[in-house]
């Protein structure tokens, strides 16, 4: 087939058929253009078939004749394709995206993203700040900060709003898109310039592009912060305000069904396809496990799925995402705070174990030599309280509606095994952070080593959201009322 005749399918069935095609001939007058951005799915209804009257439209003369490597012939009826953008194609006469975001800019609202070391502050329509707070001796607070960009004053005035409306009315502005989790998503860019000078770029000011994307249930959260080139950043913000503009709404592409009817002398489905699907079923259907294997499968539900990530500019050590079983939140919180439920993470040679209020271990398991364990840090309440007098154990943030909440707590675990390099005991700061997620029982664990044998362990989970506000002045947590 020619390149323009290729179809993208939802699944492997169509690919198998097309790979076995020798030739195709077209029925009707004109074959519609096919796009790789639109998904298709093959169906095999047989010779007696009535086209659907609802949904995606079809025409009797809109078909191609497909011939497989086994000389089987099929008449494949093609849809008049839908791409999910029908509403977007209509004329829109509402406010421009800039005007829709104007209330957010005028509110003097700020959003925050807390990572293991850095905190990112986006004050919409004003500036982006990256900072780290640390208490020094004598309770003096030390702040390391960089401005990643500032908004020019004219950009958020009524003049700027009128300019956006003028562009919308006279010549609609190009809609930019970004690949977010595998989906091309429309966004509205806001440029921030004149940030803190960058020593790596001859003291040129830092700059950022803030990408606002539609999310109906969001509260202007920061989805991600990335340094795309040296001292140039991209910040993705979720906001419900853009959802009022049809061209910025997220849409999933509908699957377009292609109905292939067998022609005289051909089976209902291609023989090669039937054979392949049979092989796939054999692979997917293992022997029924015995009782011991079933128990092992249950234990594996508590296992950790590991994957590497990059966190800020710090040296990456490990990361793990644990999917906790469906225990009740109350039971899970009690087990977590008692230290009886521990989190595991890590990739490569070393793995990590964190038990709240007990210890942080680094270990390696070998079938021949057994388990090797290094104590990274051990909990001692008095040592943590002394540490908390000089460091920030409980950090706050103000939500867009003006409510002050705890954003993160930090705990000190010292007295670990002696480090061969520094000849000092290992120690680790454990940072617990609320993380909103569609999966209420998902936990992300990552470890950094900003200095030799001095670690930062990050633990983020929706479960932690329920207990952060119980933190006392030392950052210690308790079971909520």
Swiss-Prot record:
Main location: endoplasmic reticulum
Keywords: Disulfide bond, Endoplasmic reticulum, Repeat, Signal
Any one of the GO BP annotations: ERAD pathway
Entry annotated with the keyword Endoplasmic reticulum: yes
PROSITE patterns: MRH
Matching SUPFAM superfamilies: Mannose 6-phosphate receptor domain (SSF50911)
Compartments in which it is found: Endoplasmic reticulum lumen
Disulfide bonds: 110-123, 198-231, 214-243, 342-355, 419-453, 434-465
Cellular compartments per GO CC: endoplasmic reticulum lumen
Domain MRH: 108-245, 340-467
One protein family per Pfam: PRKCSH
Disruption phenotype: Embryos display head and axial defects during organogenesis.
Signal peptide residue numbers: 1-27
Presence of the UniProt keyword Nucleotide-binding in the record: no
Taxonomic superkingdom: Eukaryota
InterPro entries: Man6P_isomerase_rcpt-bd_dom_sf, MRH_dom, OS-9-like, OS9-like_dom
Protein purpose: Probable lectin that binds selectively to improperly folded lumenal proteins. May function in endoplasmic reticulum quality control and endoplasmic reticulum-associated degradation (ERAD) of both non-glycosylated proteins and glycoproteins.
Name listed for the protein in its UniProt record: Endoplasmic reticulum lectin 1
GN (gene name): erlec1
